[in-house]
């Protein structure tokens, strides 16, 4: 139990030694609890140790397990852990009881706070890195007009949706204090609605990615007939009435705490969570069909368009499970085990905060069209500056006497 619990143990021993009546009563209660147990042969009799734990009648040679005491010298302990004591082969209890697993609840709360603060740091770090990467990707798609086809416009809008979601995440973290959270003012509810709207747009733009690839590869429908406004309606338009319906539900049935969380028995959050799960499942079906076609019909094809489709599919195959895993984690109960809870907190914090970074990497930084356009821009910039440098050097060379005399001779001849 550590140094301080050991000091408390010494004090408890002194107190118990001075009060034999209470010890005798505990022994009687422990003996009465052991009457129901059927133990034959050599055995250890029921006994209460100096901490107050009842060790029931047990066969010789057995290691007996008992829950940690709920209270010990005014301190609460975690009763889900156990203490251990051996019933020796001669039918007597071992003098030493192993309480090493028993931990103060105060210490557990401190550990939980430490893990919480680390998770907060991971969240801030991940969202900062993601936001920087997303902004760089956004500027690249904005500046590189030569690659502005419908496929890359969809990538660009997906990145924009993630930028807005990350930005509203920072707004929520920096403005919604516990006091504001409890007061449930109108502006904090609007901030929550905006964050949830951009959260939904992430999934619908991923759905747009899946629709485009499924149309081009599985349905073999010409992508020239697809229009940007169709995907704008899917990505930005459809989530809006969903969030409006959710906000109305919150206003009438769960209007508290800035619309974060939910009360037991109130399911208004499923108004926007349901469509997110639906488009996620549809995208998984799309990807299954796309991969099936790529593995059969397009394997031998080496056209540049097919290569781009394959790379887009690879990116979507990585990102869609990434988005899906992080969202499905909200429905998972990590359990009571401390290790599983800590792993769950860290894993969820990492995936949730670094999503934007992964989207930027797979759809922009690893995009061969983007990289090729950047290389061309870089070469043009180098050529332009090298020409300027050569001209500047030529202009800075002083005119030699030979050239001056020759020029004057030509002028005199012309006259």
From Swiss-Prot:
Gene transcribed to yield this protein: Crhr1
Protein name as it appears in the record: Corticotropin-releasing factor receptor 1
Single GO molecular function: corticotrophin-releasing factor receptor activity
Extracellular-side positions: 24-111, 175-189, 254-269, 332-338
Highest taxon of source: Eukaryota
Disruption phenotype: Heterozygous mice are fertile and produce homozygous pups at the expected Mendelian rate, but about 15% of the homozygous males die between 3 and 12 weeks after birth. Mice are deficient in CRF-mediated secretion of ACTH and show no increase in intracellular cAMP levels in response to CRF. Mice display a marked decrease in the size of the zona fasciculata of the adrenal gland, where corticosterone is produced, and have very low plasma corticosterone levels. Mutant mice display reduced anxiety.
Extent of the signal sequence: 1-23
Function: G-protein coupled receptor for CRH (corticotropin-releasing factor) and UCN (urocortin). Has high affinity for CRH and UCN. Ligand binding causes a conformation change that triggers signaling via guanine nucleotide-binding proteins (G proteins) and down-stream effectors, such as adenylate cyclase. Promotes the activation of adenylate cyclase, leading to increased intracellular cAMP levels. Inhibits the activity of the calcium channel CACNA1H. Required for normal embryonic development of the adrenal gland and for normal hormonal responses to stress.
Annotated region (Important for antagonist binding), positions in chain: 280-290
Domain characteristics, as noted in the entry: The transmembrane domain is composed of seven transmembrane helices that are arranged in V-shape. Transmembrane helix 7 assumes a sharply kinked structure.
Upper lineage: Eukaryota, Metazoa, Chordata, Craniata, Vertebrata
Subunit structure: Heterodimer; heterodimerizes with GPER1. Interacts (via N-terminal extracellular domain) with CRH and UCN. Interacts with DLG1; this inhibits endocytosis of CRHR1 after agonist binding.
Organism the protein comes from: Mus musculus (Mouse)
């Amino acid at each position: 139990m550590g140094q301080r619990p050991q000091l408390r143990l010494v004090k408890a021993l002194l107190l118990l030694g001075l009060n034999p009546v209470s010890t005798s009563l505990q022994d009687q209660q422990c003996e009465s609890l052991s009457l129901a147990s059927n133990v034959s042969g050599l055995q250890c009799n029921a006994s209460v140790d100096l901490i107050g734990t009842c060790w029931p009648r047990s066969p010789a040679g057995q290691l007996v397990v008992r829950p940690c005491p709920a209270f010990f010298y005014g301190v609460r302990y975690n009763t889900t852990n156990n203490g251990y004591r051996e019933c020796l082969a001669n039918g007597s209890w071992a003098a030493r009881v192993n309480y090493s697993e028993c931990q103060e609840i105060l210490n557990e709360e401190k550990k939980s706070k430490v893990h919480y603060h680390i998770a907060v740091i991971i969240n801030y770090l991940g969202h900062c890195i993601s936001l920087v990467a997303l902004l760089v990707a956004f500027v690249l798609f904005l500046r590189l007009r030569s690659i502005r086809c419908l496929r890359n416009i969809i990538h660009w809008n997906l990145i924009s949706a993630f930028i807005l979601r990350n930005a509203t995440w920072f707004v929520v973290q920096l403005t919604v204090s516990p006091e504001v959270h409890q007061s449930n003012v109108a502006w904090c509810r609007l901030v929550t609605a905006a964050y949830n709207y951009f959260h939904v747009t992430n999934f619908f733009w991923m759905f747009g990615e899946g629709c485009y690839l499924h149309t081009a590869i599985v349905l073999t429908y010409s992508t020239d007939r697809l229009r940007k406004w169709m995907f704008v309606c899917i990505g930005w338009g459809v989530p809006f009435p969903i969030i409006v319906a959710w906000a109305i539900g919150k206003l009438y049935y769960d209007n508290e705490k800035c619309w974060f969380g939910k009360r037991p028995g109130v399911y208004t959050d499923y108004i926007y969570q349901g469509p997110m799960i639906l488009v996620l499942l549809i995208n998984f079906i799309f990807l299954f069909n796309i991969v099936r076609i790529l593995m059969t019909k397009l394997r031998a094809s080496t056209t540049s368009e097919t290569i781009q489709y394959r790379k887009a599919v690879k990116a979507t195959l990585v990102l869609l499970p990434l988005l899906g895993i992080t969202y499905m984690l909200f429905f998972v109960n990590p359990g009571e085990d401390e290790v599983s809870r800590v792993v769950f907190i860290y894993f969820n914090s990492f995936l949730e905060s670094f999503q934007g970074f992964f989207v930027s990497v797979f759809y922009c930084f690893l995009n061969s069209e983007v990289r090729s356009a950047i290389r061309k821009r870089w070469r043009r910039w180098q050529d332009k500056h090298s020409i300027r440098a050569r001209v500047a050097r030529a202009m800075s060379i002083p005119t030699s006497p030979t050239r001056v005399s020759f020029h004057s001779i030509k002028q005199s001849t012309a006259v």
